[in-house]
Amino acid sequence: MYTLARQLLFKLSPETSHELSIDLIGAGGRLGLNRLLAPRPASLPVSVLGLEFPNPVGLAAGLDKNGDAIDGFGQLGFGFIEIGTVTPRPQPGNPKPRLFRLPQASAIINRMGFNNHGVDHLLARVRAAKYRGVLGINIGKNFDTPVERAVDDYLTCLDKVYADASYVTVNVSSPNTPGLRSLQFGDSLKQLLEALRQRQEDLALRHGRRVPLAIKIAPDMSDEETALVAAALVEAGMDAVIATNTTLGREGVEGLPHGDEAGGLSGAPVREKSTHTVKVLAGELGGRLPIIAAGGITEGAHAAEKIAAGASLVQIYSGFIYKGPALIREAVDAIAALPRRN
């Protein structure tokens, strides 16, 4: 069924197809039809971040930016869902066209630029949803907020989403917001993490529960830079790291139509780079922080590869676009077949 739907959707522009898919998945969720789209994955419970996941395969942020189809995605068998990236104020994102398919490489290039309806809209959608599984909310800064004041945007979003999130992801690694990736380094990272940690403690006292914080990083750092980030996360008391966001590299798409478009590359070509980052993090962290792996999972074996590299959970996005909900069960089955899970 999904193969036919994909053929029809791929006749549309990528962004139109994306918007229509969100509408259809949302409608299917309201009608309870999405459970029919693919066999449910086997139960493979895992406890991470003090949360109980029915399986370790989640939806990565970016697909449902505004939380418009939470119930729909919740019926597809994901072990958890991450929505966003959301910013304090609504913003249109970058000029179109800004989303490109590279089907020959099972890849996508995007330069969306955090287009979203703002945190208040997202929260209204979260509160209207019936989904009661693990829900991550991914937060970012507005385009027109200077990088030196980015912490204000992150704290604003954290304040607002805290009560409704199972965990919160801080996105400092999108390549499509100028200057954002500079927050991954040095004093900028240290100051951001310190502010987030202090606000997390304040909010935990206010709300009577501690919501974990995850930091999402890029795949384009050197091993030394990744090691420094890992040390900073441990020192600041962060709860998890998501590895990785999209890459600025173009290995694997050279010469393909749209292969030279500006933006972040996701899908199969980023897989090895992302998995390498997971391995470096695992070596540096030594189990002190769980790793959520994302990047290039287009087959079940790729999800198992991430777990074997040291991740506790995985997320899919581009692979879901190309393979549909069947990839969820395929990934869960492949992870279940590992001789030992981390």
Curated annotation (Swiss-Prot):
PROSITE patterns: DHODEHASE_1 (PS00911). Its EC number is 1.3.5.2. Binds 1 FMN per subunit. FMN binds at residues 61-65, 85, 138, 171, 216, 244, 267, 296, 317-318. GO terms for cellular component: cytoplasm; plasma membrane. It catalyses: (S)-dihydroorotate + a quinone = orotate + a quinol. GO terms for molecular function: dihydroorotate dehydrogenase (quinone) activity. This is Dihydroorotate dehydrogenase (quinone). The lineage of its organism: Bacteria, Pseudomonadati, Pseudomonadota, Gammaproteobacteria, Pseudomonadales.
